[in-house]
Every structure is written in C-alpha cells, then in structure tokens.
UniProtKB/Swiss-Prot annotation:
GO biological process: translation
Organism: Pectobacterium carotovorum subsp. carotovorum (strain PC1)
Upper classification of the organism: Bacteria, Pseudomonadati, Pseudomonadota, Gammaproteobacteria, Enterobacterales
Keywords carried by this UniProt record: Ribonucleoprotein, Ribosomal protein
Signal sequence annotation: none
Annotated protein name in UniProt: Large ribosomal subunit protein bL12
Length: 121
C-alpha cells in the first residue's frame, strides 16, 4: 500500500520545526537539489504583487460646473485663480503626483462632488 500526499502532509504538519529541517536536509541529499533555489524562485513573483503606495490624480473632464471645479482645484493644489483655471481648461491634466491613496481618494471625491471627471492612477 502506498502513502498518499495527504498522509505525507499530515505527517509533516505533526513534526516539530527541527524535524522538518532535518527532513528537508535529508531530501536535499537524497535527490541532489537545494530548497533555497525553490524559495528564491517562489519569492520572485511576490515583488510584482506589491501594493502601490503613490498615486497620481488626473483631471479627465470638467463637467457642467466649471467654476466649482476651478474652486476645488484651487483648494486642493494651492494654485492661484489663473493657474487653476488654465489647469482645468487643459484637461486631461495631472493635478497631483505621488500622493497617498487616502489623499488621492479624498481629492477625487471633492472634485467629483464639484462635477469633474477624475481618475486615480
């Protein structure tokens, strides 16, 4: 009678950490492989899955209430009236770069309430 994978997993789960280390060493010797290579390969794709920490807020469109959007942009960016108006009229335009997710979402919400179309990248 052969042992199933489930039985092997249950046996390994019941072992102490030292027993598992000894088992891995014995398997490395028996099969001529290294467990470190498998760990390095498995760790590679995990870096790609990192969560983004900095976001850009992009004004995609003005909407119907241009004045309210200009006021919201002025409040968020600290620009003067002329600069904020030029920025709004040049949509699509990046309003803020490298901001946190919370700040980006708050800015997006305030601009959307003013009638703008906003994207967080």
């Amino acid at each position: 009678m052969s042992i199933t994978k489930d039985q092997i997993l249950e046996a390994v789960a019941a072992m102490s950490v030292m027993d598992v280390v000894e088992l891995v060493s014995a398997m490395e010797e028996k099969f001529g492989v290294s467990a470190a290579a498998a760990v390095a390969v498995a760790a590679g794709p995990a870096e790609v899955a990192e969560e983004k920490t900095e976001f850009d807020v992009v004004l995609k469109g003005i909407g119907a209430n241009k004045v309210a959007v200009i006021k919201a942009v002025r409040g968020a960016t600290g620009l003067g009236l002329k600069e904020a108006k030029d920025l709004v009229e040049s949509a699509p335009a990046v309003l803020k770069e490298g901001v946190s997710k919370d700040d980006a979402e708050a800015l997006k919400k305030s601009l959307e309430e003013a009638g703008a179309e906003v994207e967080v990248k």
